[in-house]
Amino acid sequence: MTRVTVQTAGVHYKWQMPDQLTQQLRLAHDLREDLVTLEYEYEDAVKAVWSSYPAVAALEAQVAELDERASELASTVKEEKSRQRTKRPSHPAVAQLAETRAQLKAAKASRREAIASVRDEATERLRTISDERYAAQKQLYRDYCTDGLLYWATFNAVLDHHKTAVKRIAAHRKQGRAAQLRHHRWDGTGTISVQLQRQATDPARTPAIIADADTGKWRSSLIVPWVNPDVWDTMDRASRRKAGRVVIRMRCGSSRNPDGTKTSEWIDVPVQQHRMLPADADITAAQLTVRREGADLRATIGITAKIPDQGEVDEGPTIAVHLGWRSSDHGTVVATWRSTEPLDIPETLRGVITTQSAERTVGSIVVPHRIEQRVHHHATVASHRDLAVDSIRDTLVAWLTEHGPQPHPYDGDPITAASVQRWKAPRRFAWLALQWRDTPPPEGADIAETLEAWRRADKKLWLESEHGRGRALRHRTDLHRQVAAYFAGVAGRIVVDDSDIAQIAGTAKHSELLTDVDRQIARRRAIAAPGMLRAAIVAAATRDEVPTTTVSHTGLSRVHAACGHENPADDRYLMQPVLCDGCGRTYDTDLSATILMLQRASAATSN
């Protein structure tokens, strides 16, 4: 048995992306846009099939009418909320909206039933539409890879990602949630891929062979320098950093020769490695991902490999981790943990993993206040930037009002005061500043200088806020991963619950708290990211082959573990502690939940 791991390395921030990489990223972006267009056409064709049946068409007309009515009522309710300054306004439209939405839900259910009744009859037509979509996707391969310059592995990766997105959207729609593929503008970001194909007679794709630039089987696709882990583990930190500064060479599509033929292209990527794959790892692929951070582009490389299983861990305590977010003196509590044995928390993590008992068997996981403070500071910088945008907009509108419309640099529509008044994004003003910097409009040297001065100041604020916020959030993510690595290193089993953080957060929107308070709570929850903590813990446990048990979240807060009484579902759980109706004692819902999680996990593993 094997398990799949992805080892990520950061690309040097001063690396200048070659034009060949930009070309491949743009082709991958265009491919995704074409796939989205094909999916739109496929959905329209399927809808046309269902609409061809009179019973379904009649229900679709009813759904459209009710949907329009619900939108009108929702707008009225929104206006009343603003006018009455409450989340629950007193107005007839509120009841009408609830009734209309109920009718809309029933009409959609009736439409699904009508579709189900004619599905067998429409099977052949649907199969034809599906075959046409598959043929169109194959034609895209010929256009982009056979006749074009896109690398085939990147095509496969984009197509796989697209199919995954389509499945996710179908699952959301099945649950009654709105979901739709969308087109995206090109912003210089994306991912290219390399796949290492292996025949049965080929040698194993070990790190040593992939690192061999002279005789390696796959040297024409990927070269990743490698140090044996036995040697790596003996190095000190400085030696590891020096040995980890390497250049990865990977295939990056093709270029077109003057005679029309194609030539394979490679790129050299400087990275910083922090760990090495085992000697018996089987490397299958590599991905170079470019993301935007402010005005800059940052890149990372991920190496995908299969690693032989070493067998599940069967020693160590069982640790239950219950998610939740509450404010504390030291930060935001994102989870409560309980262990069946005492834990010796490392000194470096004692500010994040706290203990609440002398036995060191229960405690909390805290995101320190300093992370939230850093994010808040950079949000303040971003707000100053927004105010500066308002000022430059007013200045430009006043100038255009006085001097009249100006010709667009390459579009037929002129730049008018009315159109600029609608501009919201800073990038539009920055674009105009760059256009007028070298060729200002007639009598517009002053406004061109004003725009350029604003652009320079805005770029500085943009970089400061985006890079600062990114560093703060990466600090939080690193703390989550350190906590996850520690728990996976000491636990014999990890227990988590299946709480839906998004659903809980959505429910919180309907609270009676003031809107500003709700926003502050939501902002702190997003910064603390309890869902990311759970994902990190599960990923670390999977990596280290620690058994993981997921228990139901139902009743974890309502049931008092000490007496077993299940309290009613009301608003008492928003505050700590909670009064139990069964025994009359108060209890901490989070601590009680961890006891219940251990009990449920024990029952599940014993069956």
Curated annotation (Swiss-Prot):
Region annotation Wedge domain (WED-C): where it falls in the sequence: 190-315
Chain intervals for the UniProt region annotation (Roof in REC): 50-124
Cofactors, names only: Mg(2+); Zn(2+)
Region (RuvC-I): 316-559
UniProt binding sites for Zn(2+): 560, 563, 580, 583
Chain spans, region RuvC-II: 589-607
Top-level taxon: Bacteria
Region (Disordered): 74-94
Biased composition annotated in UniProt, kind: Basic and acidic residues: 74-83
Listed GO biological process terms: defense response to virus
Binding site for Mg(2+): 590
Biotechnology (record note): Has been repurposed to perform A-to-G base editing by fusion with the TadA-8e adenine deaminase and tested in E.coli and in human cells. The small size of this protein may facilitate its delivery by adeno-associated viruses.
Region spans: RuvC insertion: 391-452
Keywords: Antiviral defense, DNA-binding, Magnesium, Metal-binding, RNA-binding, Transcription, Transcription regulation, Zinc
Function per UniProt: CRISPR (clustered regularly interspaced short palindromic repeat), is an adaptive immune system that provides protection against mobile genetic elements (viruses, transposable elements and conjugative plasmids). CRISPR clusters contain sequences complementary to antecedent mobile elements and target invading nucleic acids. CRISPR clusters are transcribed and processed into CRISPR RNA (crRNA).
Family stated for the protein in its record: Belongs to the CRISPR-associated DNA-binding protein Cas12m family.
Domain notes: Has a bilobed structure, with a recognition (REC) lobe and nuclease (NUC) lobe. The REC lobe (residues 1-315) is formed by the discontinuous wedge (WED) and recognition (REC) domains, while the NUC lobe (residues 316-607) is formed by the discontinuous RuvC and target nucleic-acid binding (TNB) domains with a zinc finger domain. The crRNA-single-strand target DNA duplex is bound in the central channel between the 2 lobes.
Protein name, per record: CRISPR-associated DNA-binding protein Cas12m
Organism: Gordonia otitidis (strain DSM 44809 / CCUG 52243 / JCM 12355 / NBRC 100426 / IFM 10032)
Name of encoding gene: cas12m
